[in-house]
Amino acid sequence: VYNGLLSFEFDHLRCASVLARIGLGWMFAALLFVRFGWKVRAGITVLILVGYWLAMAFVPVPDAGGAGPFTLEGNLVGYIDRLFLPGRLHETVFDPEGLFSTVPAIATAMLGMFTGEWIKLRKEGLTDRNKVLCLVGAGAVLLIVGLLWSLVFPINKKLWTSSFVCVVGAYSVWMFALFFYIIDVLGWRKWTLFFTVIGMNSITIYLAQRFIRFS
C-alpha cells in the first residue's frame, strides 16, 4: 500500500522499502539469535561484513560498462536488483533498499541485539556504570574499524557498506550509552515522555507522513 500496491500498476510498483529492510534484517537476526550463542553470532556478523566487502570489491559486474564497483552503474547491488528484484527500482538501475545490500543490514540488527544483551546481562561486579563505559569503548572500536575500512570500502548508506555499518553502529552505541546513563543510571526520567511516545510509535509516524500533510 505504501509503495502503490492499490494502483495495480505492478510494473511501476516498488517492492523494496525501508520497512522491508528493517523486517528482513531483524527476521534473520532473530533466527540467528534463537539458534546460536553470542560468540557464534559475533563470528557470523564479521563474516557478513567481510564477505560483503569482498563481493562488492572483487565480483565483476557484466554490464558495468567500465564503471567502478562502488558507482551507481557498476555496483554489484544494482546488478542483482536488475536481475531479481521485480517492479520499479528507486534509482532506475539500482535500489538503495535492494536485495543484496540487505545482507549487511542483518549485521546492523545484530549490533543492536548485542547491545541489548549486554545491557540485560547480570554478572557479579558488573554495574550499570561499567556497562556504559564498555559501550563507549565498543563504539570507539567500531568507529576506528569503520574509518580504516572506509579507505578501501567507502562509507555509503545507499550501498550499506561494511564501513557504514561500523561507523553508524558506533554513533548508535554512543547515543544509546548516553541515554541509558542519563535515564537508567542517573534516573532522570521526567523529561522523557515525549520521546517515549515517539519511540513507541515510530513506524506509525513513518507511515503517516506518507498519507498526512503535516506542513
Predicted features, each with a name:
Residues 1-215:
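Alpha-helical transmembrane segments and their immediate juxtamembrane cytosolic regions
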